[in-house]
């Protein structure tokens, strides 16, 4: 019985530690973006990461994303997304997440992605940012999108 209790404590403390590390990775990402810390922001991604932005043309390798982001970070202010909530899934060396974010210009957005444990360090290997559209205005937004695509 004592062994079961010790194993349970280890499992729960390990899971808690893992999620604290994972949350710190993403919280740090958003803080680095807010403060315009280019190097620290991109150090959180794996070398073969992919970033999907809100525009249909925005599917970038990490190097392409760096080129896009460099001007935004150059004045010490990247972009600001406040975390509203976050969920984690997966186990082992691969985890995935979804988070609701709030941006002053875009409103509520959703970030989804995958993180991997690489050389004992969690890295973001895939991140997708999407705008959240309330169902009550989805058709109107869809029409605007279709018109913009012409």
What are these regions (language model features)?
Residues 1-7:
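Sec-dependent signal peptide recognition
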Residues 8-43, 63, 93, 143-150:
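Short, low-complexity N-terminal intrinsically disordered segments enriched in polar/charged residues
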Residues 21-22, 64-108:
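Surface-exposed, charged secondary-structure patches
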Residues 41-42, 49, 65, 97, ...:
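Hydrophobic pocket/interface hotspot
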Residues 45, 55, 85, 99-103, ...:
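A mature extracytoplasmic/lumenal domain signature
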Residues 49-60, 71-77:
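A short gly/proline-enriched turn/hairpin at secondary-structure junctions
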Residues 88-94, 115-123:
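A short, structured loop/turn motif at beta-sheet edges
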Residues 118, 126-150:
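Low-complexity, intrinsically disordered terminal/linker segments enriched in charged
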């Amino acid at each position: 019985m004592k062994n079961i209790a010790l194993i349970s404590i280890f499992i729960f403390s390990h899971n808690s530690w893992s999620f604290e590390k994972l949350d710190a990775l993403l919280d740090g990402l958003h803080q680095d973006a807010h403060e315009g810390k280019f190097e620290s922001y991109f150090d959180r991604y794996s070398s073969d990461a992919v970033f999907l932005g809100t525009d249909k043309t925005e599917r970038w390798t990490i190097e392409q994303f760096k080129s896009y982001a460099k001007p935004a970070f150059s004045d010490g202010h990247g972009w600001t997304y406040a975390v509203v909530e976050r969920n984690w899934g997966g186990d082992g060396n691969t985890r995935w997440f979804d988070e609701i974010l709030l941006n002053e210009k875009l409103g509520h957005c959703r970030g989804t992605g995958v993180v991997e444990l690489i050389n004992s360090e969690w890295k973001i290997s895939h991140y997708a940012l999407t705008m959240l559209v309330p169902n009550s205005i989805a058709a109107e937004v869809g029409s605007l999108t279709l018109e913009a695509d012409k």
